[in-house]
From Swiss-Prot:
This is Large ribosomal subunit protein uL4. One of the primary rRNA binding proteins, this protein initially binds near the 5'-end of the 23S rRNA. It is important during the early stages of 50S assembly. It makes multiple contacts with different domains of the 23S rRNA in the assembled 50S subunit and ribosome. Forms part of the polypeptide exit tunnel. Belongs to the universal ribosomal protein uL4 family. The gene is rplD. The lineage of its organism: Bacteria, Pseudomonadati, Acidobacteriota, Terriglobia, Bryobacterales. One of its GO terms (biological process) is translation.
Length: 208
């Protein structure tokens, strides 16, 4: 089991915690990470794109000129796809891009993402995030002491109003509960600050 130092909000080591080896020390599966990120990004797509078919395009349905005798090409309606400002044939229509991955794949991708962060030294276990108040200035100071990068993912296992209010206006900082964490979030932030309680929760929930 990998042993990780636990620091306080002043970045001083106060203890250590043993984390599950198959959660925080697993082999990183790049293919699983790719599939998990692709699935999450697909779920974010609005899918509101739309083109107009003949029945939706503005314009008369009257035949512009007689079928024969003019020497011109025959035409039925200005809404024809052949005409400028006419309809679109086989164009995109609103759709839902979301799809599901097997639970086993998602859990495996989460283990890979956590293990990659530990391997690269980008995950830090914090004793707790018990701020004395909800001031953004104090939250920013704590993150600075913890040597957080430009993009930071903060993971806590419990409701923490002071933490939520303190960091919500900080650019590049995201707060999530353990149940909300996705491989996309872990890989999308340079630093991950995780509370000791949340680390233990991951070890219990994701252990094989």
């Amino acid at each position: 089991m990998p042993t990780v130092d636990v620091v306080d909000l002043n970045n001083q080591v106060v203890s250590s915690v043993e984390l599950a080896d198959d959660v925080f020390g697993a082999e990183v599966n790049q293919s699983l990470l790719y599939e998990a990120v692709r699935q999450y990004q697909a779920s974010l797509r609005a899918g509101t794109h739309a083109t107009k078919v003949r029945r939706e395009v503005s314009g008369s349905g009257k035949k512009l000129w007689k079928q024969k005798g003019t020497g011109r090409a025959r035409i039925g309606s200005v809404r024809s796809p052949l005409w400028r400002h006419g309809a679109t044939v086989h164009g995109p229509q609103p759709r839902d891009y979301a799809y599901k991955l097997p639970k086993k794949m998602l859990l495996g991708a989460l283990r890979s993402a956590l293990s990659a962060k530990v391997r690269d030294g980008e995950l830090k276990v914090v004793q707790n995030f018990n701020f004395s108040d909800h001031k953004t200035k104090n939250a920013m100071g704590a993150l600075s002491k913890l040597e957080a990068g430009r993009t930071v993912l903060v993971v806590d296992n419990e409701d923490n109003r002071n933490l939520e209010l303190g960091i919500r206006n900080l650019k590049g900082v995201t707060l999530l509960a353990t149940r909300e964490v996705n491989p996309y979030h872990l890989l999308g932030h340079k630093s991950v600050l995780i509370s000791e309680a949340a680390a233990r929760k991951f070890s219990e929930a994701l252990a094989k």
